Amino acid sequence: MIYSDYDDCVISVKKEVKDRQENKMSDSQLLTTLQEHIKRGQKYGYLCFWGHRQKTPEKIDKSCLSQWYPAKFEIEGVDYQNTEQYMMAQKAKLFNDENIFQQILHTDDPKKIKALGRQVKNYQDEIWIAHRYEIVVQGNLAKFSQNNHLQQFLLSTSEQIIVEASPVDQIWGIGLAADHADAMNPLKWKGLNLLGFALMDVRKQL
């Protein structure tokens, strides 16, 4: 059963985002807020995803939620091939690394883009942490608002908690695979699930 007060949780999460922007709060507060609601007895439905390849080429599925999923969109006159490209381009831009920025824009392979993102010069962890969530939200907002078929899929997830069930990512994912016993128990997640929260934020804005 999905409780009707889901919107209250989303509002609380969005308030945490605003507060974090204004007061430099940690983005771990997003997970903390969800956990607090669960501890009070609220229950939610969950949609776990991981990977960017569709099972059937003709049918949009949850693979479209991935940062690596191929989906063209434009922001401020610049064309992007996937949200991984946007995220890493903005990372390079944030630290004024024009060389890596241009290399990222001229590469559409998300694996290579991710590697380039790790080469950004003058990188400072605290600065990236302060900006990463908003960057991913903006990239996904453009992706889903400019691709109607993808937007319809995201909206079809309704009130589900979106979970990046990556066993190897404890920042953007939950640090657990979808078939793990705790994948649908946020109280036992090993990661922050920032991508999942960003997608839910975008869903609310569409």
Give a label for each model feature.
Residues 2-206:
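Charged, low-complexity intrinsically disordered segments
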